[in-house]
């Protein structure tokens, strides 16, 4: 069994420190007890070792070399995965099989080592999936919830102090209404400052009367109660309303931009042709005035086909004539 040769190959190919490789080489001959120290770094290979024990039981295979070769294949796969950071498990398997080929010369031991690499592959995939599931993931609605939390904090800080006033309506016997209104007073939030006992008693006594907020003296109690409830509900749920309005505004703006670009008329400016005789052509164009089609008169004469031309005049010899 050429264990030193395999350790040398792993050290040169994978770049591991010699102390770690020496410990792993000793672990190949001492069983699963020494490999437990590297479970936290290289991953757990106990499941792969149990698969090797089921494949090569000692009562069927008296020789322990094949069992140790299979278990060593599990550890070699973990070492290769640790060096490659688990990027490509198929590449890790090929490197593990190459290390087994270099480490063992006999075919039975090589096959057992390759089987260990193959047995460790599904456990490595399962562990990688578990690690990926533990990583934090951002939900799609996280930006909306973040904006809502900011808005809620701002509204809570704005509602920490509010102004309030109380108003009394008294109706006399003659039908006249007398209004008593107090000046606005600042009231702090109950969770920030506890109210004294006398203020609580006065607030309980004031609730027996018709009370209005925001200093509106010419509205009745029912109308003010409905408006107050609506405004309070709006202030509590304003985060979602603001977020929805913002998202819809952005979508409408993008739609307007896309529609404008798609329906815009192409602006084409013809290029001016340069010519040596450009000035002369310009002058000729200015001098020539074309007549309109309405000013042209076409004159046609009727010709008769049956009429023949008249006889030619007689020839006169000028030499025999006397002038």
Curated annotation (Swiss-Prot):
All ranges on the Cytoplasmic side of the membrane: 260-323
Effect listed in the UniProt record for changing residue 268 to W: Does not affect ability to activate LC3
Record: glycosylation sites: 90
Sample GO molecular function, one term: endopeptidase activity
Ranges in the topological domain labelled Extracellular: 36-238
Signal peptide interval: 1-35
Topology in membrane: Single-pass type I membrane protein
UniProt motif ATG16L1-binding motif: location: 263-281
InterPro entries: Uncharacterised_TMEM59
UniProt-reported outcome of changing residue 273 to A: No effect on interaction with ATG16L1
Domain of life: Eukaryota
Residues with the Phosphothreonine modification: 303
Keywords (A to Z) from UniProt: Autophagy, Cell membrane, Endosome, Glycoprotein, Golgi apparatus, Lysosome, Membrane, Phosphoprotein, Signal, Transmembrane, Transmembrane helix
Localization per record: Late endosome membrane; Lysosome membrane; Cell membrane; Golgi apparatus membrane
PTM per Swiss-Prot/TrEMBL: N-glycosylated.
Membrane spanning stretches: 239-259
Substitution effect: residue 277 to A: Impaired ability to activate LC3. Impaired interaction with ATG16L1
Effect the entry attributes to changing residue 268 to A/F: Impaired ability to activate LC3. Impaired interaction with ATG16L1
One GO CC term, this protein: lysosomal membrane
Family of this protein: Belongs to the TMEM59 family.
Record's comment describing the protein's domains: The ATG16L1-binding motif mediates interaction with ATG16L1 and promotes autophagy.
Subunit and interaction comment: Interacts with ATG16L1 (via WD repeats).
Cited function: Acts as a regulator of autophagy in response to S.aureus infection by promoting activation of LC3 (MAP1LC3A, MAP1LC3B or MAP1LC3C). Acts by interacting with ATG16L1, leading to promote a functional complex between LC3 and ATG16L1 and promoting LC3 lipidation and subsequent activation of autophagy. Modulates the O-glycosylation and complex N-glycosylation steps occurring during the Golgi maturation of several proteins such as APP, BACE1, SEAP or PRNP. Inhibits APP transport to the cell surface and further shedding.
Protein name (record): Transmembrane protein 59
Gene name linked to the record: TMEM59
């Amino acid at each position: 069994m050429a264990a030193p040769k395999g350790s040398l190959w792993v050290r040169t190919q994978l770049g591991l420190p010699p102390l770690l490789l020496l410990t792993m080489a000793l672990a190949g001959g001492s069983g699963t007890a020494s490999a437990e120290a590297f479970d936290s770094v290289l991953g757990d290979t106990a499941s792969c070792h149990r698969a090797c024990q089921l494949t090569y039981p000692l009562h069927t295979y008296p020789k322990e070399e094949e069992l140790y070769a299979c278990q060593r294949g599990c550890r070699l796969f973990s070492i290769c995965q640790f060096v490659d950071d688990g990027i490509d498990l198929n590449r890790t398997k090929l490197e593990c099989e190459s290390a087994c080929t270099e480490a063992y010369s006999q075919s039975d031991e090589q096959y057992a080592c390759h089987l260990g690499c193959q047995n460790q592959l599904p456990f490595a995939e399962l562990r990688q999936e578990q690690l990926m599931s533990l990583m934090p993931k951002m939900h799609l609605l996280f930006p909306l919830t973040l904006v809502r939390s900011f808005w809620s904090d701002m509204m809570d800080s704005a509602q920490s102090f509010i102004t309030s006033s109380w108003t009394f309506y008294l109706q006399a016997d003659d039908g006249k209404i007398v209004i008593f209104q107090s000046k606005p007073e600042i009231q702090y939030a109950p969770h920030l400052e506890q109210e004294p006992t006398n203020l609580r008693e006065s607030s309980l006594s004031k609730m027996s009367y018709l009370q209005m907020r925001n200093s509106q003296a010419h509205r009745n109690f029912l109308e003010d109660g409905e408006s107050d409830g609506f405004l309070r509900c709006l202030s509590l749920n304003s985060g979602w309303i603001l977020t929805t309005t913002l998202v819809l505004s952005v979508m409408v703006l993008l739609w307007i931009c896309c529609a404008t670009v798609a329906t815009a008329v192409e602006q084409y400016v013809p290029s001016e042709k340069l010519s040596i005789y450009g000035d002369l052509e310009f002058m000729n164009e200015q001098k020539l005035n074309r007549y309109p089609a309405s000013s042209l008169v076409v004159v046609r004469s009727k010709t008769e086909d049956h009429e023949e031309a008249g006889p030619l005049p007689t020839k006169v010899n000028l030499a025999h004539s006397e002038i």
